[in-house]
Amino acid sequence: MRISQICTVLSTVTSAVAVGVNPLPAPREISWGSSGPKSIAGELQLRTDSDSADGIVADAWNRAWETIVALRWVPAATEAPISSFEPFPTPTAGASKKSKRASNSLQYVNVQVKDIEADLQHGVDESYTLDVEEDSDTITINAETVWGALHAFTTLQQLVISDGHGGLIIEEPVNIKDSPLYPYRGIMLDTGRNFVSLPKIFEQLEGMSLSKLNVLHWHIDDAQSWPIWVDVYPEMVKDAYSPHEIYSRNDVRNIVNYARARGIRVIPEIDMPSHSSSGWKQVDPEMVTCTDSWWSNDDWPLHTAVEPNPGQLDIIYNKTYEVVGNVYKELSDIFPDHWFHVGGDEIQPNCFNFSTHVTKWFAEDPSRTYHDLAQYWVDHAVPIFQNYSQERRLVMWEDIALSADNAHDVPKNIVMQSWNNGLEYISNLTARGYDVIVSSSDFLYLDCGHGGFVTNDPRYNVMANPDANTPNFNYGGNGGSWCAPYKTWQRIYDYDFTLNLTETQAKHIIGATAPLWGEQVDDINVSSMFWPRAAALAELVWSGNRDANGNKRTTEMTQRILNFREYLVANGVQAQALVPKYCLQHPHACDLYRNQAAIQ
């Protein structure tokens, strides 16, 4: 059996009348009644006897209710059939509405959670049901865990809207049965290239919570800077950009706690052995190599890094593993998640030419290759990482298993994050039995299409198109962005990443992450670079991109994501505009094709 599309959404949407709300991500099953609006009493009171010891449910409800009351949300972009246009006018039938009797006002939110002790770890049950009945004064939420209850609240926030007269309503009785397609749904934040402040990190977590993303992959450091304090080697933060651009232990705890309160796991990444210069060299300069080399775009065959600045851990130097082990243990102690990302991407062989330890190791046995060197890292570093605890699960970039100089044997219990060659590498990794996080750069890299950041680049100094018939650097080419073009929300949403996988292979896909590499990102633009495009991924991995008949629902998604962008902004997330406001107010008037089934 072959899976021809990303798991067809099991979503069922039934409605006897039109409603304005259009929650994102779309629930798996939602059924609307037709008896008329359910008004909200002065305050919806939470009733539950099943909360966690630290009050996760109560705190989340308080935040949700405060948001509902403060916003008194009016949907900014509602769904409607495409309008009639000249020269093909269509008569408009007179509309009529039957009168509807008033129903009981809603006064309570009753929440029942089966397992209040379930920890926020990979695979935890996030399902919930939400029911608003015609003759009831209670919104009923049932969830297997508190984390499912939190998702119910974020759905409810989008269902309760202004009645236009100062009150609040839910437009019709509604029944929702919801759960995610994939357990791993994330974005990646890079704070190694540019520092991102705590308030801005919190802002991303708000967007994630509203869209039901549940993993913040935190790429903490890179060759350019080491921004996190570690007690064991306090000198490492000498390579932070400034004393004000350091994450303290308390900062990390605040980020983790803020995320957990919203059902979001924080998975740290320390990229090793490549992308490693800052921080490490302060502990022992001998444990890093090629840090003082020119990265060498001038003579690419000799390059020591794919971008400035170079630096890698010395794989053969014994003390490397002592220092790495100490840093890893300390960071593992302050991040409660069972998963830890240990990098493994873009190892540059030329960098090791600057290491006397590595060159001597090669000289001792001329049959040795860079594959053997990568395997040396796996054999010596991975046991240190895995032995932290029985629950520990490692994540690595695919390069360690698939690059030109990959290791021979990478344990199958390591999760591979796939970023190159799209469907080809996904198929390769899953066929070999690896669990895979999809981060294909052709679809999910959010920094793509913004040009290059390296300066002194003569390629831009061209005043006329040198070849009008062939795309080139400044004329139809990538303009310095290696992964151009820009990934629009439609590009992200349309990604069928299980295409042509067998059923067995498809089971190895645990989810997806949209990375935002930080070379051109800081506090000023981080939110607009993530949002609302990350919301397209959120729906893709929550309920899919197809309807119950297997048809792509990108056209249907349009008004939903346009409305959600406005909702993000109303909640303090500085999401980028996607279209002229005219398009929000005129459903599908900005479609490329009048044919509403143009996308298959």
Curated annotation (Swiss-Prot):
InterPro entries: Beta_hexosaminidase_sua/sub (IPR025705), Glyco_hydro_20_cat (IPR015883), Glycoside_hydrolase_SF (IPR017853), Hex-like_dom2 (IPR029018), HEX_eukaryotic_N (IPR029019). Keywords: Carbohydrate metabolism, Cleavage on pair of basic residues, Disulfide bond, Glycoprotein, Glycosidase, Hydrolase, Polysaccharide degradation, Secreted, Signal. It catalyses: Hydrolysis of terminal non-reducing N-acetyl-D-hexosamine residues in N-acetyl-beta-D-hexosaminides. The precursor of the propeptide is intracellularly processed in the endoplasmic reticulum by a dibasic peptidase, different from Kex2, removing Lys-97--Arg-101 from the precursor producing the activated propeptide. The propeptide binds non-covalently to the catalytic domain. Propeptide binding is necessary for full activation of the enzyme, dimerization of the catalytic domain and secretion of the active enzyme. O-glycosylated. O-glycosylation (O-mannosylation) at the C-terminus of the propeptide is necessary for full enzyme activity. N-glycosylated. N-glycosylation of the catalytic domain increases the stability and solubility of the enzyme, especially at low pH. Contains high mannose-type (M4-M11) N-glycans at the C-terminus. N-glycan deglycosylation does not affect enzyme activity. GO terms for biological process: glycosaminoglycan metabolic process; polysaccharide catabolic process. It is found in: Secreted. The record marks 307, 482 as: Essential for chitooligosaccharide substrate binding. Residues 1-18 form the signal peptide. The active site is at 222 (charge relay system), 275 (charge relay system), 346 (charge relay system). The keyword Glycoprotein applies. The record marks 306 as: Important determinant of glycosidic bond specificity. This enzyme can be used for synthesis of lacto-N-triose II (GlcNAcbeta1-3Galbeta1-4Glc), a major oligosaccharide component of human breast milk, and its positional isomer (GlcNAcbeta1-6lactose) from lactose and D-N-acetylglucosamine (GlcNAc) by reverse hydrolysis reaction. SUPFAM superfamilies: (Trans)glycosidases, beta-N-acetylhexosaminidase-like domain. Its main location: secreted. Optimum pH is around 5. More stable at alkaline than acidic pH. Pfam families: Glyco_hydro_20, Glycohydro_20b2. It comes from the Eukaryota. GO terms for cellular component: extracellular region; membrane. Residues 19-96 form a propeptide. One of its GO terms (molecular function) is beta-N-acetylglucosaminidase activity. Glycans are attached at residues 78, 83-84, 318, 353, 387, 428, 500, 525. PANTHER family: BETA-HEXOSAMINIDASE, BETA-N-ACETYLHEXOSAMINIDASE. Homodimer. Oligosaccharide moieties may also take part in the dimerization. Dimerization is a pH-dependent reversible process. The individual catalytic cores dimerize and the catalytic core of one subunit in the active dimer interacts with the propeptide of the second subunit. Belongs to the glycosyl hydrolase 20 family. This is Beta-hexosaminidase. It comes from Aspergillus oryzae.
